Design a protein with these regions (language model features):
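N-terminal leader/presequence regions that precede the main folded/catalytic core
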Residues: 2-7
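Acidic anion/phosphate-binding donor-loop and adjacent secondary structure
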Residues: 148-149, 184-198
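Active-site and donor-binding regions of nucleotide-sugar-utilizing enzymes
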Residues: 1, 12-185
């Protein structure tokens, strides 16, 4: 619980900083695998829900050049649980960038995958996706509450369930939705099944 609270506090502070220092560009580490990334995965925090919702797709993107833009070092996540067994940390290049460099560094991106368009990197990459004509995919990473921010215009939502998709889209016609399940709940069920089998 303490780790979760620290992640939430850091995300809130990052969000507040990005609003109060508007002239300062959002910075982060950009990892790339391949020469022409077509998918940009964006994270504003490494919370457990974000790691499972946003990094887990790396396992299924073996044939695609990928970029990952994060607030801090992500080496631990690129060489094990979340990255494909085919790839290791050495397959990724790394550089510190600001959001205004995305257009020059990632001209071939077709999909931006994020969990929050209202935080620093999420907001910058939403604008980046609009500028280059890329799709912006939002991934549900936690339970929805009535205070959840609205989805960005024209996005594709990957939701836990049809009910979650319907609730969050709120009847909007500009949002495309897909019910894909929850990686966190899937892993919890697998862990519970494994523990039950060991009894």
């Amino acid at each position: 619980k303490l780790k979760w609270a620290k992640y939430k506090l850091k995300a809130l502070l990052d969000s507040a900083r990005s609003r109060t220092v508007a002239e300062e560009p959002v910075r982060g580490l950009l990892y790339t695998r391949g020469t022409k990334p077509q998918v940009l995965i964006v994270m504003d925090s490494f919370s457990p829900t974000n790691r499972n919702a946003i990094l887990e797709p790396l396992k299924h993107l073996d044939a695609v050049d990928v970029a990952l833009w994060v607030p801090e070092d992500a080496s631990d996540y690129l060489d094990g649980q979340y990255a494909s067994e085919r790839y290791s940390r050495k397959d990724w290049s790394e550089q510190e960038i600001s959001g205004d460099e995305l257009n020059n560094l990632l001209p071939d991106v077709r999909i931006v995958l994020s969990a929050a368009q209202f935080l620093g990197r999420g907001a910058v990459t939403y604008e980046f996706s609009r500028a280059i004509g890329a799709e912006y995919w939002m991934v549900q990473h936690g339970l929805l509450v009535p205070q959840a921010p609205p989805l960005p215009v024209g996005c594709t939502l990957l939701a836990f369930s049809e009910a979650d998709a319907e609730f969050w889209a709120s009847g909007r016609r500009d949002v495309t939705t897909h019910a894909v399940g929850s990686q966190l709940l899937y892993l919890a069920a697998q862990k519970a099944a494994g523990a039950e089998a060991q009894k």
